[in-house]
């Protein structure tokens, strides 16, 4: 499928918004490759800290096990550190999983303004909750890279093995229905105001995430075009 991409910018500074299972883990690597940008998945950053049992990781695990969110200061500093020290972030970044609240969005804007790198776009992946439940309960993740698969919708070439490294895939422990419903309730309550925030600042764009991944990708590129 050829398409005119002349309207798509060469670099991007954006936020990817969407509930768990909306396809952020599928689309973010496409964006990273297309724009030579870094993918800052705050969930992956935190899980990495938890796995390494750093002081931050131990503190974060306690908070996450209670179904709560890690403090804004910790998250902002973690992102700032990546933007400053990660060479992959020089050409742009895709923030995934942050911000989740209006105060976070305001603090993020403030920090990015100080760096002279304000957000250009906030793309929301929109999808129905019931479809999400069926999608996410079959989700498989490659811990080292964050690549995600699905038992039904996007299976790996070899069962329970990562396509690229051949390493084992895991099913996240919080990917069961009850935990998911709790996460969705939290998502809607806390994250939907973010959409209104970015609509007001004029950088929001919405994409129907129930479509096939290739169609979603095409729609994301259209959103990123300089209007």
Swiss-Prot record:
InterPro entries from the UniProt entry: Adenyl_kin_sub (IPR006259), Adenylat/UMP-CMP_kin (IPR000850), Adenylat_kinase_CS (IPR033690), Adenylate_kinase_lid-dom (IPR007862), AK2 (IPR028587), P-loop_NTPase (IPR027417)
Residues covered by region (NMP): 41-70
PROSITE patterns reported in the protein's UniProt record: ADENYLATE_KINASE
Gene Ontology molecular function terms on file: adenylate kinase activity; ATP binding
Keywords assigned by UniProt, alphabetized: ATP-binding, Cytoplasm, Kinase, Mitochondrion, Nucleotide-binding, Transferase
Enzyme class: transferase
Location of this chain's protein in the cell: Cytoplasm, Cytosol; Mitochondrion intermembrane space
Binding sites annotated in the UniProt record for AMP: 42, 47, 68-70, 97-100, 104, 172, 183
Top-level taxon of the source organism: Eukaryota
Main subcellular localisation: cytoplasm
Gene Ontology BP, a term: ADP biosynthetic process
One Pfam entry name: ADK_lid
Keyword presence, Transport: no
EC nos: 2.7.4.3
Residues that hold ATP according to the record: 21-26, 139, 148-149, 211
Family note: Belongs to the adenylate kinase family. AK2 subfamily.
Subunit structure: Monomer.
Domain comment, as recorded: Consists of three domains, a large central CORE domain and two small peripheral domains, NMPbind and LID, which undergo movements during catalysis. The LID domain closes over the site of phosphoryl transfer upon ATP binding. Assembling and dissambling the active center during each catalytic cycle provides an effective means to prevent ATP hydrolysis.
Entry-linked NCBIfam families: adk, PRK00279.1-2, PRK00279.1-3, PRK14527.1
UniProt-listed PANTHER family: NUCLEOTIDE KINASE
Record's protein name: Adenylate kinase
Gene source species: Kluyveromyces lactis (strain ATCC 8585 / CBS 2359 / DSM 70799 / NBRC 1267 / NRRL Y-1140 / WM37)
Lineage: Eukaryota, Fungi, Dikarya, Ascomycota, Saccharomycotina
